[in-house]
Amino acid sequence: KGITYNVINSHLNNIVQQSIDFENKCLTEKLKVTKELIQQNISTNKNKLDEVGEIREKTLFDVFDEFIKEIGNINGWTHGTYEKYIALRNHLYIFSPNLSFDDLTEKGLADFITHLRDEKGLRNSTIGKQLGFLKWFLKWSANNGYHKNMAYLSFKPKLKTTEKRIIFLTWDELMTVYNFSIPESKKYLDRVRDVFCFCCFTSLRYSDVYNLKRFDIKNGALHITTVKTADSLTIDLNKYSQAILDKYDGVPFEDNKALPVISNQKMNDYIKELGQLCGLDQPETVTYYVGNERVDEVYPKYELMGTHTGRRTFISNAIMMGIPPQVVMKWTGHSDYKAMKPYIAIADSAKAEAMKLFNEK
């Protein structure tokens, strides 16, 4: 039936382990080994065999679960990364509950792409990421002897995409938020504003500001190991970030946290509310493709704001201030200069606009 050696070895290992477990149980519980007891043990584990005693091959989804467990453990995946691969598994299952490796020919892969586009309504950029995750799984499973279907190697669909728009606050907008007088009826936004602005002044991701402890702050700098990439960073404090820390000095928080950080989802909701309150409602256009169809959507800026806006605000303003990208990368933990290019483009555009001011004199 084309069963791979990995499947056979896995099955034999299971049988050996079951025998060891049975022997240990008899010893610890001082059971008398009888024919009936042995038959009962075999019956308990009969799901490992099919009706005629043949080895049952793992399904694609069994292998996918093994992939997630092994690769996630080796690479120290964050909760967010696990969620991405679980989402892919769910997409595959909805596409075909009995999906096999042999089904994923170029046509099968194309059908899956069509399913993601037409049935799930995913953007091309999202489909591209899902395909990348799927190819990693197929490569890993092929290397581990689970299949010999290499169609994924030559499957390279042309998916129209656009550069992702970077939503950030200009310095004036950031100062508007930082200095805004929040009304008494919305005082619950005060702490959210402080944490958000702290990210804008330090480049911290939500996961890192959430984990920030008081003992991480020494000699005028933050000394952290990032959650997402496990980078060890030293981020110097400026007068704005220091003032926010000073505001909460002596205020006790759970787990010795430095700041009052709420859940990511709740904070995202409140940041949008804060942006609206501060009048950050200029129209922003978001462009993307679904198949060959171009979609342009216009939103008030505050609707596009979230915890991620803090980090992007720091990078954009730092580069526009003239701080060299290689210095900014030391604070942010970026190792790839390519990641800085969109921000440098923003800074170049801003400089061109600034030069026009001379024409008005």
Segments the model singles out, each with a brief description of its role:
Residues F215-A221, L304, M321-P342:
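Short, polar N-cap/turn motifs at the start of nucleic acid-interacting alpha helices
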Residues T202, N211-K247:
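Conserved tyrosine-mediated DNA breakage-rejoining catalytic core shared by Y-recombinases
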Residues N124, G128, H147, A151-Y206, ...:
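Basic, Lys/Arg- and aromatic-enriched nucleic-acid-binding interface segment
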Residues V177, D236-A243, K247-D249, P342-K361:
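DNA/chromatin major-groove-contacting recognition/catalytic segments
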Residues H91, D102-L104, E119-L153, R205-S207, ...:
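N-terminal DNA-binding recognition helix of tyrosine site-specific recombinases/integrases
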Residues T226-A230, M267, T332-L357:
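Catalytic-site neighborhood detector that most strongly recognizes the C-terminal catalytic loop/helix
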Residues E184-K186, P252-F253, K257, K272-K330:
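Short, basic (Lys/Arg/His-rich) helix/loop patches that form interaction surfaces
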Residues K1-K58, D62, E66, E70-N75:
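N-terminal helical hairpins
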